[in-house]
C-alpha cells in the first residue's frame, strides 16, 4: 500500500503541474474505490476491531491509515476544498488550513516494485477465490464469506509467493488450504465451513 501511495503521489504531482485534472481525479477515485474500499479496508477491519491495542499489526494498520488520510486530504484539497478543510480541522492539531499545507514528499523507501508485483499476484488469487465464493452465495449454499472453507490449487510460480500470507484473512474466509498443482490457472473449491459463525461477525 505504501508503494501505491508513493506512485500515486508522483502521478498526482505530474498531473497537477500539467493541469491534467481529469486523470488526477480518475486515479484518486480508482484508489479510493478499488484499492481502499474493495480491498484494504475490507481485509483490515477485523484487525482494527478485534486485535488488542498493543498488537503490532493493529498499530501498523493505524499508522498506515493516518498516512492515507493525510495524503487524501492534500490530494483532494484542490478538488473538494470545503470538505477537506472541514475534515482537516477535525483531525489536525494545527490551527492552519489544509490549503496552507505542502504536498507530502514521501521517502524513496516507500517504493517497492517487487512487493507490489507480489501483491498484484496475491490479489489475482483473491479475486479467483471471491468468484468461487460468490457462486456459492448465488446458490444459497453460504451467506457470508466467513462461512466458506477454501481449497486453492496454484501453479509452481504462484505457490512460491503464498508463504507468510494469511489467506484466510486475505479472502475473509473461515479456513484455507493451499496445494501446488500443474495447471496454469488458479483452481478454487469452496465448501461450507464446519462450525458456527460468530453472531458479532
How does the language model describe each region?
Residues 164-178:
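A glycine-rich helix N-cap at a beta->alpha junction
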Residues 32-33:
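Hydrophobic residues within the alpha-helices of tandem HEAT/HEAT-like
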Residues 198-201:
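Short cysteine-rich clusters marking metal-coordination/redox-active sites
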Residues 16-23:
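Short helix-adjacent coil turns
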Residues 1-13, 41-132, 139-154, 177-188:
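Acidic, turn-prone loop/beta-hairpin segments
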Residues 25, 29:
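Aromatic-lined ligand-binding clefts that engage carbohydrates, nucleic acids, or primary amines
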Residues 187-195:
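Short, flexible, mixed-charge glycine/proline-rich loop motifs
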Amino acid at each position: 500500500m505504501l508503494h501505491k501511495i508513493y506512485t500515486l503521489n508522483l502521478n498526482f504531482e505530474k498531473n497537477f503541474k500539467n493541469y491534467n485534472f481529469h486523470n488526477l481525479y480518475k486515479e484518486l477515485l480508482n484508489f479510493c474505490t478499488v484499492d481502499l474500499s474493495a480491498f484494504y479496508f475490507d481485509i483490515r477491519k477485523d484487525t482494527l476491531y478485534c486485535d488488542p491495542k498493543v498488537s503490532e499489526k493493529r498499530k501498523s494498520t493505524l499508522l498506515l491509515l493516518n498516512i492515507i488520510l493525510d495524503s487524501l486530504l492534500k490530494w483532494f484539497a484542490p478538488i473538494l476544498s470545503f470538505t477537506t478543510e472541514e475534515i482537516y480541522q477535525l483531525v489536525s492539531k494545527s490551527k492552519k488550513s489544509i490549503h496552507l499545507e505542502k504536498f507530502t514528499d514521501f521517502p524513496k523507501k516507500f517504493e517497492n516494485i517487487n512487493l507490489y508485483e507480489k501483491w498484484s499476484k496475491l490479489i489475482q488469487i483473491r479475486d479467483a477465490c471471491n468468484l468461487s465464493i460468490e457462486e456459492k452465495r448465488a446458490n444459497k449454499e453460504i451467506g457470508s464469506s466467513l462461512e466458506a472453507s477454501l481449497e486453492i490449487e496454484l501453479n509452481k510460480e504462484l505457490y512460491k509467493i503464498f508463504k507468510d500470507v494469511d489467506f484466510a484473512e486475505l479472502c475473509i474466509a473461515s479456513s484455507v488450504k493451499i496445494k501446488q498443482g500443474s495447471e496454469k490457472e488458479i483452481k478454487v473449491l469452496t465448501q461450507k465451513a464446519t462450525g458456527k459463525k460468530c453472531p458479532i461477525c
